A protein has these predicted regions:
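C-terminal cap/substrate-recognition subdomain and adjoining C-terminal extension
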Residues: 2-25, 107-273
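A metal-dependent, Asp-based hydrolase signature
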Residues: 40, 45-135
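Non-catalytic pre-domain segments flanking phosphatase-related domains
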Residues: 1-30, 35-42, 50, 56-57
Length: 273
């Protein structure tokens, strides 16, 4: 991954030499890409829980009218979530994990997530991913998270990533007077929805400046949820060089995507140091 960082820094330098005022971006998935495991679902390996997911913690804390109130709530939720994914698909299952907290305080759930990231999840960021993430941040590349987890959970990672909260994007539901509802807001940051969110971010940046805006890189870990936005980035035409799209621990690419992405394997996390 250090070689990829060096390549990106070289691309950054070439773009700024050609367009000195350019605004440069990189986009990341969160779960399985920056974070080992899943902030919503937790991390379990070898029959052992390495950390609990935020859905479990929030249900235990009493934030879900559907599942809080008895000890079986987290298990019932997990079973319903898996059944949705198997019978209907991830496009419905991922939003479900945001909608089950209808009536809860968005502020309270984001605070719960921030505590979990700051005390536990920050130790499970992949070391190599953080090397690239921190290296790009150090030279002023504007980085955004595009996650299929609920946005009120994802934004809990802001302090641990040293990012403004508005740069962390997840699945959103409408809020009324600070309380969550079941009504989804679009785009839903799953698959093609991540492309739509990325385009909205770049168009907003272009509207703020007369200088050019370039996307250097995109990082993901799933050909289901991430291939669309990675492909969108790597197929850009830059005035010099070529953007990178990196798949982490993703396995074999579908036929139409072979040779398009860099493939990286990693397991070590910052807490292993």
């Amino acid at each position: 991954m250090e070689e990829l960082l060096a390549e990106l820094l070289k691309l950054r330098a070439a773009l700024l030499a050609l367009r000195p005022g350019a605004r440069l971006f990189a986009f990341w998935d969160l779960d399985g890409t920056l974070l080992r495991g899943d902030c919503s679902e937790g991390l379990h390996e070898g029959g052992r829980e390495l950390y609990p997911g935020l859905v479990h913690l929030a249900i235990e804390d009493g934030h879900s009218p559907d599942y809080s109130g008895d000890d079986s709530g987290p298990l019932r939720c997990r079973n319903d979530y898996r059944e949705l994914g198997e019978r209907v698909g991830a496009w419905l299952a991922y939003p479900f994990l945001a909608q089950i907290f209808s009536g809860a305080s968005e502020h309270d759930l984001q605070a719960l997530a921030a505590r979990h990231f700051d005390t536990t999840l920050r130790k499970f960021y992949f070391s190599a991913s953080r090397t690239i993430f921190d290296g790009l941040a150090a030279v002023g590349v504007e980085q955004h998270i595009l996650s299929a987890s609920a946005e009120f959970f994802v934004r809990g990672a802001a302090a641990s990533l040293a990012l403004p909260a508005h740069r962390l994007h997840g699945i959103r539901v409408r809020t009324v007077e600070g309380k969550l509802t079941r009504e989804l807001l679009y785009p839903v940051t799953y698959a093609e929805g991540k492309v739509t969110q990325l385009i909205e971010i770049i168009r907003a940046a272009e509207a703020e400046t007369e200088q050019p805006v370039f996307v250097l890189a995109a990082f993901g870990n799933s050909f289901d949820t991430d291939k669309a936005f990675l492909a969108h980035v790597v197929r850009q035409s830059l005035p010099v060089g070529r953007p990178l799209a990196v798949m982490i621990n993703a396995g074999f690419a579908p036929t139409n995507y072979r040779g398009l992405f860099r493939s990286v394997r990693q397991k070590k996390v910052v807490g292993d140091r």
